[in-house]
Every structure is written in C-alpha cells, then in structure tokens.
Amino acid sequence: MQQKLQNTKNLVSDVFNKVYNKYDLMNNLMSFGVHKSWKKQLIYSMNPRNNKKLIDVACGTGDIAKLFINATNSRSKVSCVDPSKKMISFGKNKLKNYKNISWKVAKAEKLPFKDSQFDYYVISFGLRNTKNLSKSLSEAYRVLKKGGRFFCLEFSKIDNDYLDFLYQNYSKLIPMVGELIVGDKKPYEYLVKSIKEFIDQRELIDLMKKYKFEKCEYINLNGGIVALHSGWKV
C-alpha cells in the first residue's frame, strides 16, 4: 500500500534533514509538550521487561529509546533507525551517554537486520512518513521474534466534532510556527497534509492483521489526535 505524497522524490528525507536541529523544540511547541506524555503512555502500555531488545524505527532524536532504557536496565538494547542521516547524527550525540543504544540510517521498508531479532518494535510518528505501509509492516513482522510486540504511535482521526474543528484550525498555524522557528514553513505544510491523508484507526488495524499481526488493538489519546496501535507476532 503506497502513499502518494510520500513517494514524491526526496520529499520526506529533505523535510527531516531541514528540521533535525529544531526537531525536539518544534515537537514541544506544536504539541504544547503533550508528545512526552504520549510516548510515556507507549512505554507504559509496553511494560517492557529487562534484558530485551527494542528496535525504534523512524526514531528521530531517540526519545523512545531513552524512555525504554530508563524503564529497564543496562543490559537492555535499542537499535535506533531513521532515514535521515542528520537526525541520526543529532540523536546519537544527544544520547551519547547511553552505550546500549546503536544507530543506523535505514528506512522502515528495508531494515538492515536478520529475521526474528527484536522483542519490541516501535514506530512513533513515523509510519505516516513511509512510502509503503505494506512493506513497512511486513518488515516489522519479519524482524520481531515470535512472541514479540509491535507498537505504532501516530496522528489519527479525531472522534469528537468540536475537538476536530479546533484541531483543524490550529493545524493551519503550524506552518507559520515552523517558518518562525526553523525558517521554512514547507516541512510543516507537509506535516499537516500527511496527517490529513493518513489512514484511520480501523484501517490500520485491518492492515496490521493482513500482515500477520494478531491480538491487534488501539487506544485513542486526547480524543484521537493520536492513536496507539499494538499487535503481536505469535
């Protein structure tokens, strides 16, 4: 299942190579800091055990990796993967004291790992940016161990008309904020458009099931502004 907007040549990589050094700041501004609680909810839902391996795909600057290591122990390991070289470099420097986090430049559709390597797979605000949802989910299933769990935290469809009205109007301001902070509004015009075009909660559940995940479920956060999906490789 290809995504038309994301298949525009070099669009997504150019977006994140432009904003990497202001990525954390913009996340805080755009969500009023709420993205931190969404990510903590993901880790809480995961309830990770010690000495396990996580792959964090479309890792950004490594927020999920840091939360995972802090919630487990020093023998847990995280492989952070992102298609943006600049984002990987920035995240690696940001978390340089975390010796059990490794970093690779790669895309969700083609992960540089052998089959059945990880206990947990996370993609946080990244599935929407992939060129091909089907390939991304197939790769997620491939690299998970049997009994491993998949998590996707992503912008979704709001289930309240009033909240949706407020959000749609607020989203019009995001490119202006991006221009003020980053000096370029185009990456944030892409952000807003990609959110509008992304599939809804039930469609993602159906796609997960198509690619062999079982016990698939989701919870809406903040009225569906964001949804947390999960499934198992059994």
Write out the residue ranges for each language-model feature.
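Hydrophobic beta-strand segment of the Class I
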Residues: Y23, Y121-V122
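N-terminal, positively charged/glycine-rich alpha-helical extensions of SAM-dependent methyltransferases
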Residues: M1-D24, Y170, I181
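Conserved alpha-helix/loop element of class I SAM-dependent methyltransferases that forms part
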Residues: F32-K52, L67
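A short glycine-rich, Lys/Arg-flanked "PGG" loop and its adjoining helix->strand segment in the class I
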Residues: S134-R149
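A short acidic, Gly/Pro-enriched loop at the edge of an enzyme's catalytic core
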Residues: E109-Y121
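C-terminal alpha-helical "lid/dimerization" subdomain adjacent to the S-adenosyl-L-methionine
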Residues: N10-L11, V81, L153-L207, Y211, ...
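Class I SAM-dependent methyltransferase SAM/SAH-binding core
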Residues: K53-K110
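Core SAM-dependent methyltransferase catalytic element
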Residues: I205, Y211-V234
